[in-house]
């Protein structure tokens, strides 16, 4: 301490820079205790920021930072600080050198952490973290720097979770073999839409879909934790203003982090057009915005207020229904994937009781409220309208879940008849087609079946399936309330007699009249117990 007493304020500042440059930060606390005014906390942090090499292991100086920030008195030193580098400098020379130091500011450029309430230590740590990343690329050192401090600052904790955690997972855990690592500056420069696209597009194409789920939970989830940061809000707002098509969800995106999660829903919908299996896997294995992994730095179940969590959960469920409607693939695999999606959505939103299921050999009798569904226009099925919160087809309700699952069961039934169409096409037939169009589509189904007809075809089952497709009923009621059955079934505008007629015409085309008569005489006709509407059929001049 004796050597320090002979130093001026200028000498003390220069000595502090020397200690930092040599990595000997242990003496800074002792030096500050001798010059508390000259080496106040802000100036000392700026000296450390400017002169301490970024490659220095944080464990060597984090305890000093804590002591300086807390104002802890320096312990009695075991040995005096070496003042020889500065003690012989004339005062004028020392002052001149101090004026030329050009200390870095505590606040990182373009950083929003300086909001008037952020303490100097937090500003220092954020700036120091960026310098470590820029100069060394060792983001693990940044984690070592922040771990002792993140719990004392909400700003710092948010920054660690939303910026550093996704980068550590991306660069070191999930994709360590990538040629280029992503920097903090690059990630922080992204708006919500770009970040979601980059982080989710990292998923490697493969046989399973765990990569996408992992990225949703472990990359996008933490990123969204920082949606309230001023810089993020500014970037995302500017991106929305510059976008040709504005968000369908502007009412909520400006006041919560729903804007970012809306981009996730948009990405899933868009991605499903080219990689349906992977998106199906996401809905089957990820439970939406509340299903995130924040690395233990924050309790996941406390990140979203109740109302906001429920809203985001519903919007995610809507994205699931939208994905099903938008899927153009008519394969059996895609259809089974659609069943997976709607089942997962119904389970997540506690709407499972409204799913249409087959529990026995017969197709179920269905009846549910269609008022909101029947009022939709063709525009409701356009891709840019599927995520609109007010869309009755995709907004998750008991009606929308029942209707869509009925459509999917209809598609499965059509597939068994050899006629495959998309979910969107089925919805249009049911909701927006005239009686002529529905009849034409029915004939297409029958013709397809007849064209590929087999001798052993079970016509009784075929008839039951087509009649069920008409009105989603297993058996005809004693008295049918036409109004209550509107929009129930793909061919609800076509009369039951016409459906019966079309089935019989197809059967005759496949089996031939002579075979039918022969089997009738022999008593082996498999259709002998079917109550055909013969009078109506004769009136149509199909039989003599």
What are these regions (language model features)?
Residues 3-57:
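Charged, amphipathic alpha-helical stretches
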Residues 22-26, 37, 41-42, 54-62, ...:
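Extended alpha-helical scaffold segments
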């Amino acid at each position: 301490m004796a050597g320090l007493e002979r130093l001026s304020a200028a000498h003390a500042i220069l000595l502090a820079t020397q200690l930092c440059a040599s990595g000997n930060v242990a003496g800074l606390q002792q030096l500050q205790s001798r010059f508390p005014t000259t080496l106040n906390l802000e100036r000392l942090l700026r000296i450390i920021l400017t002169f301490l090499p970024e490659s220095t292991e944080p464990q060597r100086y984090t305890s000093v930072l804590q002591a300086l920030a807390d104002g802890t008195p320096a312990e009695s030193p075991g040995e005096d600080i070496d003042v020889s580098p500065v003690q012989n400098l004339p005062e004028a020379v020392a002052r001149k050198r101090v004026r030329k130091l050009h200390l870095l500011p505590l606040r990182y450029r373009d950083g929003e952490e300086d909001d008037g309430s952020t303490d100097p230590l937090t500003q220092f740590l954020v700036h120091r973290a960026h310098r470590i990343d820029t100069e060394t690329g060792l983001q693990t050192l940044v984690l070592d720097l922040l771990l002792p401090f993140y719990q004392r600052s909400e700003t710092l904790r948010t920054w660690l979770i939303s910026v550093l955690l996704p980068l550590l997972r991306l660069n070191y855990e999930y994709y360590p073999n990538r040629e280029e690592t992503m920097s903090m500056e690059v990630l922080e420069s992204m708006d919500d839409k770009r970040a979601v696209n980059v982080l989710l597009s990292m998923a490697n194409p493969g046989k399973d879909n765990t990569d996408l789920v992992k990225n949703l939970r472990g990359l996008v989830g933490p990123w969204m934790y920082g949606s309230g940061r001023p810089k993020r809000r500014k970037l995302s707002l500017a991106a929305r203003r510059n976008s040709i098509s504005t968000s369908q969800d502007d009412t909520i995106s400006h006041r919560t982090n729903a804007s970012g999660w809306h981009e996730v829903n948009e990405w899933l919908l868009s991605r499903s057009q080219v990689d349906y299996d992977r998106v199906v896997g996401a809905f089957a294995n990820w439970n939406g915005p509340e299903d995130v992994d924040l690395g233990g730095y924050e309790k996941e179940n406390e990140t979203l207020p109740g109302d906001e969590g429920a809203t985001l959960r519903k919007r995610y469920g809507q994205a699931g229904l939208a994905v099903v409607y938008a899927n153009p693939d008519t394969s059996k695999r895609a259809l089974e994937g659609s069943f997976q999606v709607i089942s997962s959505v119904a389970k997540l939103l506690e709407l499972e009781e409204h799913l249409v299921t087959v529990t026995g050999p017969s197709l179920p009798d269905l009846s549910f409220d269609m008022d909101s569904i029947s009022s939709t226009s063709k525009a409701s099925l356009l891709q840019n309208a599927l995520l609109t919160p007010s869309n009755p087809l995709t907004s998750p309700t008991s009606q929308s879940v029942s209707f869509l699952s009925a459509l999917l069961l209809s598609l499965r039934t059509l597939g068994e008849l050899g006629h495959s169409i998309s979910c969107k096409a089925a919805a249009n037939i049911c909701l927006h087609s005239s009686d002529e169009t529905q009849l034409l589509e029915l004939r297409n189904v029958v013709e397809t079946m007849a064209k590929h007809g087999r001798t052993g075809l079970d016509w009784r089952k075929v008839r039951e399936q087509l009649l069920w497709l008409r009105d989603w009923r297993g058996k005809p009621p004693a008295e049918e309330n036409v109004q209550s059955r509107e929009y129930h079934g793909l061919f609800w505008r076509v009369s039951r007699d016409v459906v019966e007629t079309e089935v019989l015409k197809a059967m005759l085309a496949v089996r031939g009249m002579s075979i039918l008569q022969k089997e009738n005489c022999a008593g082996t006709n498999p259709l002998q117990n079917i109550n055909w509407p013969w009078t109506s059929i004769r009136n149509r001049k199909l039989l003599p």
